[in-house]
Regions:
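Extracytoplasmic catalytic/substrate-binding loops of multi-pass membrane glycan-assembly enzymes
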Residues: 37-51, 60-72, 80-84, 304, ...
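Transmembrane-helix motifs of polytopic, lipid-linked glycan transferases
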Residues: 88-108, 142, 146, 150
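Membrane-interface anchor segments at the N-terminal boundary of transmembrane helices
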Residues: 81-85, 89, 323-415
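Membrane-interface alpha helices of multi-pass inner-membrane proteins
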Residues: 164-179, 207-214
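Short acidic/glycine- and proline-prone juxtamembrane loop motifs at membrane-interface regions
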Residues: 129-139, 178
């Protein structure tokens, strides 16, 4: 967590930096430790319940999760049969990543910004709740943002340090492979490798290739599959949307999908179930639930190939209004946290349905669990303000705009990566889950430094821009 170039600082300054990082780490450890003690072993949710149940049955691939997350779960919960063994290392990683960024900001003498990010981002009840749960979204989102932060620092100095190499190696697998949309992080990693000199470039390549090969090999050996991906759920969910019965029964709306699409879909779900089981906010009713009535899991490769072809050649274009409305609805329902939520005390009842060595509240704390529930519920009632990802989204747009105006390639790559992530979430989400947008709640940790804390900058020459606009006074900083 500490800068790599501490030896080059004066003695008093070195002590100041050490104190800042230690204090930040201790505050975060205290906050996360108290929270986890009150929710031990952590909220399960439907995904956590499925993960534990399938690992217990030696069938983790049927969770539909990505191989990297399943490998981690097998190496922790699978070997110990304890949920806390899975959660605690992730909590420590989150504390370390947050202390790294917030401490860096404080060292640059922005105490108000650092304190605001500590209180309004790092230690908010919903972040603590997701961070201690069996969902990979919190650690994935934070790792994604923290890895972009490290890339930004390295690009500012055009060199790798021991600390930066360690951070890249630690954060990369979670940021890239814990969820399918993490693959986007390969773009800034590739850009970083190109911008660095030969030796450093090969270090980046080695980190990417070694982790990628290890996860691919582990997933193959453990027969973990490839998850359900993003395209299949989208096509099935939206095709069901397009096939909803229209009460007006207008002539113009009688052929909203191809005859072949109707034939394929009706092999696996009846029209009555298409009308009754479709939920505009969730695809769970078509996949995870009602498997006696919806047999999409049994769909043959040939049928899905034909369905995919019809979707992109006719069905999508015939239903642009319905598709756009569906995308906007799910995105806004997610951003406003109007979907399902897992409370802090979820494990109280969730553990009863699975076989595990973990127990709820093993410390027999009497008031802390109830207090945390009350804090969480109060925060939830103000979620439209306190949980809003729109601050991060606005900052992404501001940084992207400035990068275009100043033709600053480094910032353009960083902000474009987040915009691609946002576009992917908008286009491919099939459930109104707030956790999908957690990366943009974390985004101010990265974007406030980029937007407001000057870093060594080397903008591309722009003949149309005044020199004073594209050149800034550098501030000495260490990665």
């Amino acid at each position: 967590m500490m800068p790599s170039s501490l030896p080059r600082q004066g003695g008093a300054e070195r002590l100041r930096i050490i104190r800042i990082y230690l204090c930040t780490t201790l505050i975060l450890l205290l906050a996360y430790g108290i929270w986890y003690a009150g929710v031990w072993p952590g909220p399960l949710g439907q995904d956590g319940y499925s993960l534990i149940a399938n690992i217990n049955q030696s069938a983790p691939r049927y969770t539909g999760k990505d191989p990297a997350w399943l490998l981690y779960a097998l190496a922790t919960y699978g070997l110990s049969q304890r949920v806390e063994v899975l959660v605690l290392p992730l909590l420590l990683l989150q504390v370390a990543a947050l202390a790294r960024i917030i401490g860096w900001i404080y060292v640059r003498r922005y105490p108000i910004t650092a304190t605001a990010l500590l209180l309004l981002v790092a230690c908010t009840p919903h972040v603590l709740n997701y961070g201690s749960s069996l969902y990979p979204d919190a650690v994935f989102s934070l790792a994604f943002v923290a890895l972009l932060f490290e890339i930004w620092l390295i690009l500012g100095h055009r060199r790798l340090s021991t600390w930066s190499i360690a951070w890249l190696a630690i954060l990369f697998p979670a940021a890239c492979y814990f969820k399918a949309n993490g693959i986007i992080i390969l773009l800034p990693m590739l850009y970083l490798a190109i911008r660095l000199k030969t030796t450093s470039r090969w270090v980046i390549v080695a980190i990417v290739l070694s982790w990628s090969a290890a996860i691919q090999w582990g997933g193959t050996v453990a027969n973990l599959g490839h998850g359900h991906g993003a395209l299949r759920p989208l096509i099935l969910f939206e095709t069901t949307n397009f096939m909803q019965t229209r009460p007006m029964n207008l002539w113009e709306t009688r052929h909203m999908v191809t005859d072949r699409t109707k034939e394929i879909m009706h092999r696996y779900i009846s029209q009555e179930d298409i009308d009754s089981l479709y939920d505009r906010d969730y695809w769970d009713t078509l996949w995870h639930l009602n498997q006696d009535r919806v047999r999409f899991r049994e769909m043959s490769r040939i049928d899905f190939r034909h369905l995919r072809s019809d979707f992109f050649t006719y069905n999508l274009w015939r239903n642009i209004p319905a598709f756009t409305a569906s995308r906007i609805n799910i995105f806004l329902a997610s951003a406003l946290a109007q979907g399902g939520m897992v409370g802090p005390d979820n494990a109280r009842h969730g553990l009863a349905g699975v076989t595990t060595l973990s127990t709820y509240n093993p410390f027999n704390l009497s008031s802390l669990p109830n207090t945390l529930n009350e804090i969480y519920e109060t925060s939830y009632n103000w979620r439209f303000v306190l949980w809003s990802p729109f601050v991060g989204i606005i900052l992404v747009l501001l940084v992207f705009k400035r990068a275009l105006q100043e033709r600053h390639l480094d910032e353009l790559v960083i902000s474009s990566t987040l915009l691609l992530q946002l576009g992917g979430i908008f286009l491919f989400s099939i459930a109104a889950e707030y956790r999908y947008l957690l990366a943009f709640f974390y985004a101010p940790l990265l974007l406030f430094p980029i937007r407001f804390i000057q870093q060594n900058r080397d903008p591309l020459p722009c003949q149309k821009c005044p020199r004073s606009r594209s050149t800034r006074q550098p501030v000495t900083s260490t990665p």
